[in-house]
């Protein structure tokens, strides 16, 4: 049977399309090219995250300057350290870092914290001089850092003299390299004050002022020179000029407040005295408000407020402000010591014992609650902290002899604390026995304990034998008011 070939009457015969084939060839070749380019990194895949721009050291430097101007000194230090991670050989960054580290030490409370920060500042200045041995500003900042390290409440007298001598040498070298360096001239004046060369200090700072440069550091040093001469009103005027140039640096407000408090302490007129103390409180409150606006948790302004209230005899307000300071640094032993002194002055002798114990010996969690809240942690519904005590030093000796004096005064034959009081008195005697006031306190305490041993308990009022502590106006070391 023959079947005829089907004719394409109703459908098209399949046939090749030249254009379609050309399109597919081009598409395949383009795909191969794209894959190779992606593998080589010339073409980036879709939907990958956008790369984050790498910051330069200049951006961190600008951030550091801005943070310092804003009063955020710790943030400024962090920014400059980030800049140095990118450019560790930049001497100018080391200079700026050292200056801020030095100033920031004024906001720290404990001896150890100040000592550590000042050592870091000096290390930064040393690095600046190493990188730029012919740079005037590097030597000026190293002189500044060494002068602030020469703090007799932090180091012994021999080290103080060594630092002051080296600081003067650096200041002289800075001016030899550039006699137009106004900051070097100002820092030299500050060094001369600490060397008790007041006439030379005045000459140097007047030269710096006559150059007409509007520098915060120059007005600050001029105020410091005037403070050392007892010219507290003029010192306030110059601190205010420094504040006008750097309105967010809270340590300047603390200096003004301290000078007003000193004027109040020395005023014979009761109304004037009260007015001066209130002005002092206003400046400390400004510092606290600036910190609050900046989000800076600094106990310093509240401790300064407490000192002023203590000077005014308003011990309840003083204790409230010390407790506010403890909210920022609840493990700071120095603040416990200051709280103990306030309790002591308000004749809350029993309450002063746990606070002073935490300051000098350290204490467990339960004792820290007793010190802060006057009750157990459970009753206060608070969590206690373990506190590390502070070593005996010129800044902490008041806590030691006050603690021992209270223990002696509260001793009774049936509840005798004199054994512990003897131990503390012996420590103080070994280091500060040549101080007549301290020697008198020790002798009085030992007399009380001798009476207790003989069955003659003291009157509680004998505890008032202790003289003024850290709430006093003028430390022996510097002759300038304490903030």
What annotation goes with each model-predicted range?
Residues 65, 99, 103-106, 144, ...:
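Residue-level recognition of tetratricopeptide repeat
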Residues 82-85, 123-130, 169-176, 206-210, ...:
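Conserved structural position within tetratricopeptide repeats
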